[in-house]
Amino acid sequence: KGFAAGVVSTARVTHATPAATYSHICHRDLENDIAAALVPGGTGYNSALGATGLEVVLGGGAQFFTPFKSGGKRSDDRDLVAELKAKSYTVANNATDFKAVDPAKTDRLFGVFTSSHMSYDLDRDAAKEPSLAEMTTKAMDVLAKNKKGYFLMVEGGRIDHALHETTA
């Protein structure tokens, strides 16, 4: 329908809730396959997302986008971050890179700031990880350029985890 779309989460972007936005993988634990579903035109890509895929993906979970040899969990040696860069995504790996992104000059933004889930907000190092509010604001600024509108899935995933642990 022409809407821009994105996901923002303090959990891994391959975790169940954000993954349901863009992936048709049958099991939530298949996070390598879920990550591959984000790369437009790549093996495992969810073609229901159209030719260009999501415009914004921000959160945790870098391990599912990088191969074993680079410290990730991908056994297929695919470097999905490099593949996304090749598809014209602006990539931010830390809060400094993220803050430097100009939404007016950015059409596609990908940022996974931690290997797994992002830190609880009380433990977050602001130099390494943007906050949920910062990610959401930047995502909205990028997506709002689409005159037809946008859909943005925002999840405070770490509050869910804290509640599971009864540490909220």
Residue ranges: model-predicted function:
Residues 1-130, 134, 140:
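Surface-exposed loop and adjacent secondary-structure segments within mature catalytic domains
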Residues 148-165:
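Short acidic, glycine-rich surface-loop motifs adjacent to enzyme active sites
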Residues 168:
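Metal-dependent active-site segment of extracytoplasmic phospho-/sulfohydrolases and closely related
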